[in-house]
Every structure is written in structure tokens, then in C-alpha cells.
Amino acid sequence: MALNVVILAAGKGTRMRSDLPKVLHPIAHKSMVQHVIDTAHKVGSDAIQLVYGYGADKLQASLGEQQLNWVLQAEQLGTGHAVAQASPHIADNDTVLILYGDVPLIQQSTLEALLAARPENGVAILTVNLANPMGYGRIVRTPCEGQEQGKVVGIIEQKDATAEQLLINEINTGIMAVPGKQLKAWLSRLSNNNAQGEYYLTDIIAMAHDDGVAIDTAQPQSAIEVEGANNRVQLAQLERAYQAREAEKLMLAGANLRDPSRIDIRGEVTVGMDVMIDINVIFEGKVTLGNNVTIGAGAILIDCEIADNAEIKPYSIIEGAKLGVAASAGPFARLRPGAELKQDAHIGNFVEVKKAVIGVGSKAGHLAYLGDAVIGDGVNIGAGTITCNYDGANKHLTVIEDNVFVGSDTQLVAPVTIGKGATLGAGSTITRDVGENELVITRVKQKHLTGWQRPVKIKK
């Protein structure tokens, strides 16, 4: 039996006041609908039907390379009408899981519980109890022996509910698991004879009851999982809820967050034990932190690997880089893709490293650019050093071997190799290879002009 997931994503989202389709608005740097798609994959979907409408070009530009079956809903005539558009792509023996592109926080564990709750050839509905259920469809039950809550007999929408039904606190989330054959039959029987003139997906529950089909329910761990975003205020609330959830995961995994409310996680972060993360740190992409790593305030880490005992000092940007054991970067350092700091290496303030390896114990303390370079062990890079790697057309490599001392304000014009133990005098421009243990100084001889006077400002 295949798991066929239908994701409803056709709405415009007028209240967002945006040209962007509602489901493409981001949570943690990823569109809401992408969160839902990713979760669908995690529960083992065999096929995903994406029901789209408004902003088709933008949706396809964002999601087009993924394994999705695109189903057009030309007119938005209700949730039942939306699912019906996917009917031709649903097999009789499929289990159909219905999700929503603007409900991004639904968790894998919740959907697995819902699927497990579905009776054989029956229906499972995800419900939640709210203190204030205003605006939601209510779950209608009737007393049944052996079922404390009673048997589900239908779902009534807010606008169609009686005064008595409005007192019900158990609400429909819209998420459900349904057998394919029966779903298609029920969808064909839907009517829009209701207060909103729409084809309600929820009406299939009463049909299931009338047909004698077993109906069961499951509930999420938290109500926030099933909340959607119709405007930017709600979007921000979902963002905060997502960040709080991810921060909690980090703390349970061994990280100490200085303030869990001031961290942004926009990807997948793996942490070791006794990690310390200060305030206003941003993680993007896939980030791995070893044991005893320290991350300073305001740092940004993107797709990087940080080994045990390493330190990222405040306001540094680490992207596509690797830091070895006890290496350090910052404050105000920038490591670009391809940068690698070996054990005990140090990159200081206002140093930029790109596609360069910094050897064991080597250091560049301040104000330097090191690009397209291989730097050995025990090297000292003075302030103001630049590897001149670009000739206007191509990039070239600079090699600095072990135990080299590079004086301040030195330019190394690549391609060039500096031999082991060499010393480069401050202010030198190196255009040719330097041998082992050589001292090279290229600056102009110092001149002393006696009797010289500074210009005097002319009075006007």
C-alpha cells in the first residue's frame, strides 16, 4: 500500500499583502511549503501531489527540480475541490495523507502517529483541543460504548455550526489519512450547499460515518504544529515557535545557549557536549560543532565544520569552512568557502580567508587577505599581508611552507612559493619564489632629507 501525499498550496494569501504566493513565505530561511514537503519525505511518501494555483511560475521556480506531481487548481472552490483535482493521480489502494502548504511546523512524529491511528480501510483525523476554538471546524462525536470521547460522526464548519456545536473545543486541523478508493468516491459526492458556497473536504467524514467506515483521531504534541500563517504577524509567530523548538533540541543535545530566545537556526545543526553559544548567533545550512566549542555573540555560521575545543569569536562569518581542534577565528573574521584552519591555527580580526589552508599553529592576527593559498605549520602572517591571487583573468596559488615569518604589509604576487623558515621583511612585494631560510626585503632604501619644511596653509 503506497503512501500518496496531497499538499494543498493553491491559495494566494491576500492578507500577506505580497506578490509572493503564501506558501513560499519563509520560516527559518525555507519556504513553508518546503518544510511540509521535507516532512512528507521523512514519513516515507511514495508520491507527492502538489495542488497549486496562484503564482505558479514562482512556485515552480522555487520547487521545480523536486520530485513532485504538479496538480493545477484553476479556481479555488474549497479544500474538497482542491483534493479532487488530485484524484486522477490517486490509486485505489493508496493511503492518502492530506497536508497543507501553509502549516509548516507539523512534525514527522505526529504524522507517523496519525498514520498508525488509521484503522484498516478507515480514516484518521488529526484533531486538537483549544480553549478558544473560534474560526475552526468542530469535531462532532456521538456517545459510543468503549470510547470515552465518543465516536466521530462528522466535522461542522464554524459558519454552519449550531450554538451547541460552537461549544465544542475539539477542532479539525484539516490533516487526515484516508483510503484512496473511498476518498475518490466521497469527493465525487461533495456539494457546495453551505454557508460559504465551497466544497468542504470535511464533509467526507460524515460520508465515511454513513458508509460504516471506521474513523479514529490522533493529536499533535503541541497545537503550534497545526497552526497556519495567513498574515505576517502569524508568520512571525510561527518563526518564533520554530526557533524555540530548535533551540530546545540543541540544549537537550548538549549545548548551553546564553539566551535561547536570541538564536536563529536556519538549517541543520549538530552539536557535541558542552558547547557554548552566545546571543544573536545565526546558523544556516549544515553546521557541525564538536565538543567544547565556543561561539561568540553575533557570529554567522553557514555550512561549516567546527572541531573540538575550537572557538569562533564575536561577529565572525564562517561559511563553507573547517576549523580543526582548538583552532580559533575572530573577532570580526571572515572565512569563505574552502577555508580550512588546522589544529591550533588562529585567524584574527579583519582577516579574510578564501580557499586556503592554514597549517597547524599558524596565525594571521589582523588585517590580512589570504586567498588561494596553502600555508604550512608554524607560520606567522603579519598585519596587512595580501596574497595577490587574481591577475584579472585567472586565480593563482600562493604556497607558504612551514615556519615562515611574513612581515607586516607584505604582498605575495601569485603564483609564488615561500620556502621553509624564510623571513619576508615588512613592506615587501614578493614576485618570485623564495628559498628556504632566506631573508627577503624588497622595500626602497630609506632616505633622510634634512631642512625640509612642511607646506604652510595659504590664508584666503
From Swiss-Prot:
Residues 233-253 are annotated as: Linker. Its main location: cytoplasm. Homotrimer. The keyword ATP-binding does not apply. Binds 1 Mg(2+) ion per subunit. Coiled coil: none annotated. GO terms for biological process: cell morphogenesis; cell wall organization; lipid A biosynthetic process; peptidoglycan biosynthetic process; regulation of cell shape; UDP-N-acetylglucosamine biosynthetic process. It is found in: Cytoplasm. Catalyzes the last two sequential reactions in the de novo biosynthetic pathway for UDP-N-acetylglucosamine (UDP-GlcNAc). The C-terminal domain catalyzes the transfer of acetyl group from acetyl coenzyme A to glucosamine-1-phosphate (GlcN-1-P) to produce N-acetylglucosamine-1-phosphate (GlcNAc-1-P), which is converted into UDP-GlcNAc by the transfer of uridine 5-monophosphate (from uridine 5-triphosphate), a reaction catalyzed by the N-terminal domain. Pathway: Nucleotide-sugar biosynthesis; UDP-N-acetyl-alpha-D-glucosamine biosynthesis; N-acetyl-alpha-D-glucosamine 1-phosphate from alpha-D-glucosamine 6-phosphate (route II): step 2/2; Nucleotide-sugar biosynthesis; UDP-N-acetyl-alpha-D-glucosamine biosynthesis; UDP-N-acetyl-alpha-D-glucosamine from N-acetyl-alpha-D-glucosamine 1-phosphate: step 1/1; Bacterial outer membrane biogenesis; LPS lipid A biosynthesis. Acetyl-CoA binds at A383, N389, Y390, S408, A426, R443. GO terms for molecular function: glucosamine-1-phosphate N-acetyltransferase activity; magnesium ion binding; UDP-N-acetylglucosamine diphosphorylase activity. NCBIfam families: glmU, PRK09451.1. Residues 254-460 are annotated as: N-acetyltransferase. In the N-terminal section; belongs to the N-acetylglucosamine-1-phosphate uridyltransferase family. Pfam families: Hexapep, NTP_transf_3. The active site is at H366 (proton acceptor). Its EC number is 2.7.7.23, 2.3.1.157. GO terms for cellular component: cytoplasm; membrane. Mg(2+) binds at D102, N230. It comes from Shewanella baltica (strain OS223). It catalyses: alpha-D-glucosamine 1-phosphate + acetyl-CoA = N-acetyl-alpha-D-glucosamine 1-phosphate + CoA + H(+); N-acetyl-alpha-D-glucosamine 1-phosphate + UTP + H(+) = UDP-N-acetyl-alpha-D-glucosamine + diphosphate. It is an enzyme of class 2 (transferase). This is Bifunctional protein GlmU. Residues 1-232 are annotated as: Pyrophosphorylase.
